[in-house]
């Protein structure tokens, strides 16, 4: 059954799809009698409220779609991973559009998932096929893209039992504003503390493993004398740079062969073509307070 809102995180953002529809309507209404107005650019900002809800069975398709955007063509069973996320619904949230008044023109699906957050304990779920495939993929990329020290530390974490590692998943569509991440992460930390108190696997994590969608600008064909191309790593979810700064193991691998040039949501770059990457990070859980403070400073308006 559909879940009810257990807490609310209201934010404002622009929905590109809605803006496109508004633009089309404006052009149709202007008619042929006013061709000049019909050619004018329509730049309408759409106000959207979002709410955080407890994860439920109804969210399967939405969560799976977001996981597919993260993992692309790698051999991770996103259906099985989605099932795990739904089964442990005592931790994590999904983002939906706030309840729309009956007299509103908005015909969107009230159960549409715009994003989600969750934590899956990898150490406690050893032998689960989709998670083993995920760990194999990370270790393979680590061998190719990380340092020998990074490889050794990653192997010890993912293949050993001495320290518990949780997979932190925080995904949303690009048109959802980053400010919504702050209350979601704060709520997740509270839920993990409660899971620890009640001896649930999600509360036993000593390290946090993240896979972030990142991009680097495509290098220009010609560079002026003395001008060096900056190898800048851009995070699709802006706030995840706070985790990157505190990571003790981190590396990036290119997914250009698996995806088109990614849109970062940083429109000030004039939609400059980007080379898509995935950035893997390991963060000690005792650094979460520092991360949350940095995130608060960055996202608080």
UniProtKB/Swiss-Prot annotation:
Keywords: Cell cycle, Cytoplasm, Cytoskeleton, DNA damage, DNA repair, Nucleus. The lineage of its organism: Eukaryota, Metazoa, Chordata, Craniata, Vertebrata. Its main location: nucleus. Belongs to the BCP1 family. It is found in: Nucleus; Cytoplasm, Cytoskeleton, Microtubule organizing center, Centrosome, Centriole; Cytoplasm, Cytoskeleton, Spindle pole. GO terms for cellular component: centriole; centrosome; cytoplasm; mitotic spindle pole; nucleus. GO terms for biological process: DNA repair; microtubule anchoring; microtubule cytoskeleton organization; mitotic spindle assembly; mitotic spindle organization. Residues 1-43 are annotated as: Disordered. The keyword NAD does not apply. The keyword Oxidoreductase does not apply. This is Protein BCCIP homolog.
């Amino acid at each position: 059954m559909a879940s009810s809102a257990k807490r609310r995180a209201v934010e404002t953002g622009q929905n590109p799809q809605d803006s496109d529809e508004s633009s089309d309507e404006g052009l149709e209404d202007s008619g042929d009698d006013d061709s000049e107005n019909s050619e004018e650019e329509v730049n309408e900002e759409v106000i959207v409220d979002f709410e955080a809800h407890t994860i439920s069975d109804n969210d399967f398709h939405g969560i799976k779609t977001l996981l597919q955007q993260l993992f692309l063509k790698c051999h991770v069973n996103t259906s099985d991973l989605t099932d795990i996320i739904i089964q442990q619904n005592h931790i994590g949230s999904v983002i939906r559009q706030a309840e729309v008044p009956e007299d509103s023109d908005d015909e969107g699906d009230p159960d549409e998932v715009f994003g989600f957050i969750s934590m899956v304990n990898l150490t406690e779920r050893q032998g689960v096929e989709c998670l083993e495939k995920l760990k194999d993929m990370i270790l393979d990329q680590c061998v190719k893209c990380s340092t020998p020290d990074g490889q050794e530390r990653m192997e010890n974490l993912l293949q050993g039992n001495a320290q518990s590692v949780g997979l932190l998943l925080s995904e949303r569509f690009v048109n959802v504003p980053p400010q919504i991440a702050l209350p979601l992460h704060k709520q997740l930390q509270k839920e993990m503390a409660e899971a620890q108190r009640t001896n649930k696997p999600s509360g036993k994590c000593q390290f946090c493993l993240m896979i972030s969608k990142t991009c680097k600008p495509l290098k220009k064909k010609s560079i002026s004398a003395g001008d060096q191309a900056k190898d800048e790593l851009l995070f699709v979810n802006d706030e995840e740079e706070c985790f990157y700064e505190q990571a003790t193991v981190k590396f990036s691998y290119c997914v250009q062969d698996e995806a088109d040039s990614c849109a970062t949501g940083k429109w000030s770059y004039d939609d400059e073509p980007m080379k898509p990457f995935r950035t893997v990070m390991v963060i000690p859980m005792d650094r979460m307070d520092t991360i949350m403070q940095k995130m608060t400073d960055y996202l608080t308006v």
